Amino acid sequence: MEAFATFKKELSSPKNIFITTHVKPDADALGSSLGLANYLIKKGHQVTVVTPTDYPYFLTWMKGNDAVLDFSKSSEKVEAQSRLQEADLIFCLDFSVLSRVNELGELIRKSKAFVVNIDHHQDPEDFADLRYWSTQAAATCELVYQLIVELGDESLIDKDIAECLYAGIMTDTGGFRHPNTTKNVHLVVAELLDKGADSSQIANLIYDSNSVNRLKFIGFAITRRLVVREDIHTAYFVISKKDLKKYQSQTGDTEGLVNYALSLDGIKLAALFSEREDGIKISFRSSSDVAVNKFAASYFN
């Protein structure tokens, strides 16, 4: 409670605010970052959003996208470092350990700014002055909405903010199909729709903006790279760097691929193993009766 009181006091006057999220941001990561940024700008703060890496092209419609700094680009890194050094408050969104932001992690750890961590993932690292965290939330965007309401500023949520937050909730619930689609999710989404969020347009922008190469890649992956083990109710994809290069893969092109494996009848656990320059990225999905999060936490960083 004391930390939240300090946080509210910090926000009571204009501040330099730095917002960041995890590598390869998805809709919840970018939506929560830009939704929060647009709200704080309306409150009179100077806000900078920095991502550790690039993010999918189908998220660039969000308001504030043009001002986002990509820390992995040398042309933007110096400015991002300067903004971090000037920050009075730092918001860390949609990640629970500082290793998820690459080089930015140690810079944040050393900063004297007030650090706020907003996240819904399990086992958070203790690096923040204020942890606004709940595994009961379906998405970080849901928590950002809750925070704005708790601060008494629900009236400041406009169409642009609502659409950023809606996008993150929609995708992190699998289009409102996953077990994390709670009553509260529907209540929050109803409020965002009342604020002007266009659900049909957002779905089209995220799910129906495929390039020809991406569709060909998905077809290739399903026909040539899908392994099904019916005996253990498991299916998985193994994608090499060569595969990604062949189809001129862009950031976000593997997004949602693992869901095709989970959609198979009788499959309870699905995985995607994707070879990258810096290692193997693994994505897991499971049915409600398989605790894949505990498995991932036990065996992977």
Task: Describe the predicted segments one by one.
Residues 2-20, 31-63, 69-71, 78-81, ...:
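Hydrophobic helix-and-loop "lid/oligomerization" segment in the mid-to-C-terminal part
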Residues 20, 24, 92, 117-118, ...:
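Generic enzyme active-site microenvironment
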Residues 23-25, 95-98, 121-123, 241-242, ...:
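Short glycine-rich anion-binding loops that position phosphate/pyrophosphate groups of nucleotides
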Residues 27-33, 98-102:
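Short glycine/serine/threonine-rich phosphate/pyrophosphate-binding segments
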Residues 35-37, 107-110, 133-134, 187:
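Glycine-rich, phosphate-binding/catalytic loops in enzymes
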Residues 64-68, 110, 133-136, 288:
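Short, hinge-like loop/turn segments at secondary-structure boundaries
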Residues 69-130:
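Active-site cofactor/cluster-binding pocket
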Residues 118-188:
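Short alpha-helices
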